[in-house]
Every structure is written in C-alpha cells, then in structure tokens.
C-alpha cells in the first residue's frame, strides 16, 4: 500500500507542474493584453489633450463678424399668398367664378362714372351761360393817378416810355383809364383811352393821340 501511494504521488507531481505551467502561460498573455490596452489609453489621453489646447487657441481668436447680405433676406411667413385662379374647375369656383348669376357685374364690369341709374352729376350741374369771345382784346390798364406819379412835370406818354418806367409789359396793348386826377399837361399816345380819362387830360391842357 505504501508503494502504491508513493507511485501515485510521483505520478501526480508532473501533472500538477504541467497544470501550474499552463495556468501561468494563460495569465501572462492576459497581463500583456491589459498592459497593451493601458498603453493606448494613455496615448489617447495625450491625443485628447492636444485638441483641448487647439480649442483653447480657437476660443482666444476673435469671433468672425456675421454680415447680412441680400440673399439672406426672406419674406415673412404668410406674406406670399398665391392668387386663386377662379373658373378652373369646381375646386376653384368653376361655375360662376364668384360673380354670381346674371347682371352687369356677372358679364363684365360697371362702366366708370355709373351712379346706379340716377342722373349723373355732370348732367345735374347747371350749364355756364354765354361764351368766350375769341376776338376779345386784353389791355394793360394805367390810371391817371399813376401817370401823375410817373410824370410830375408833364410830358409825352407813350407805350415805350411806360415800358421803360416799368409801368407796363412790352409787346402788349395799353389803355388809360380815368381813375384819379391830373393837373399837368400830358400828350398821351397809347392804344386806347377811356372817355373820362380823355376829358380830364384835355381839361388839364393835354392831348390824346390814338
């Protein structure tokens, strides 16, 4: 029995040694793999640290100014509304196109100036009487009081002299009227003189030449 135990122990020792050797061999690659994983992790930390520095540099840089351009502009929501094309089927008021049935507004449109059938305004207003004479002659008017002011010592009154004194405009007819009094001698030669003005001029010793 003692010999059997010793032989069994001797046979078991090599088996145990082999088992421990295989266990150590399995543990060694696991440790190496863990070390390899730890090394890239450390490298990753260093790599990750570099972008942090880069981002810090970017933060330090001045922000880029945003410029508003024409192509950035857009109409407000709901501002652009498509026009309804009526009369293009039952979905778009296809029968009467929103005009109703019969009548002037259904066929075309009310003419400009139509006032609902009542007498139009241009027919209700009264007409201007008379007419404008196409042969009417317009005169520039000069009264005797103005002549007394312009000619305090008397003299010859002509259209050219009155134009030179600024009393009338040139190239237009002149008429002397009798408003005011005259006490000096005037020789009047203008286009027309009223009856009262002629009497006063002659009474003051002057003359009238037409």
Curated annotation (Swiss-Prot):
GO biological process: translation
Record field: compositional bias (Basic and acidic residues): 79-93
Protein's gene: rplO
Top-rank lineage group of the source organism: Bacteria
Region (Disordered): 1-64, 76-104
Naturally occurring in which organism (per UniProt): Leifsonia xyli subsp. xyli (strain CTCB07)
UniProt GO cellular component terms: cytosolic large ribosomal subunit
Residues spanning the signal sequence: none
Organism classification: Bacteria, Bacillati, Actinomycetota, Actinomycetes, Micrococcales
Record protein name field: Large ribosomal subunit protein uL15
HAMAP family: Ribosomal_uL15
Keywords: Ribonucleoprotein, Ribosomal protein, RNA-binding, rRNA-binding
Complex formation: Part of the 50S ribosomal subunit.
Function: Binds to the 23S rRNA.
């Amino acid at each position: 029995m003692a010999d059997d135990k010793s032989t069994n122990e001797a046979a078991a020792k090599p088996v145990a040694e082999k088992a421990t050797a295989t266990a150590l061999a399995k543990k060694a690659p696991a440790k190496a793999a863990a070390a390899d994983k730890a090394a890239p992790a450390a490298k990753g930390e260093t790599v990750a640290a570099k972008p942090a520095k880069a981002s810090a540099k970017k933060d330090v840089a001045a922000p880029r100014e945003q410029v508003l351009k024409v192509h950035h502009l857009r109409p407000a929501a709901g501002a652009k509304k498509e026009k309804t094309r009526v009369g293009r089927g039952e979905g778009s008021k296809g029968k009467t196109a929103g005009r109703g049935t019969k009548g002037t507004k259904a066929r075309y449109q009310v003419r400009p100036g139509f006032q609902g059938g009542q007498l139009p305004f241009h027919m209700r207003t009264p007409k201007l009487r008379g007419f404008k004479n196409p042969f009417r002659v317009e005169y520039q008017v000069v009264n005797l009081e103005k002549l007394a002011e312009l000619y305090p010592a008397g003299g010859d009154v002509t259209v050219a002299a009155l134009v030179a004194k600024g009393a009338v405009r040139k190239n237009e007819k002149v008429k002397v009227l009798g408003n005011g009094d005259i006490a000096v001698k005037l020789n009047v030669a203008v286009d027309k003189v009223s009856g009262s003005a002629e009497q006063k001029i002659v009474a003051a010793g002057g003359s009238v030449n037409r």
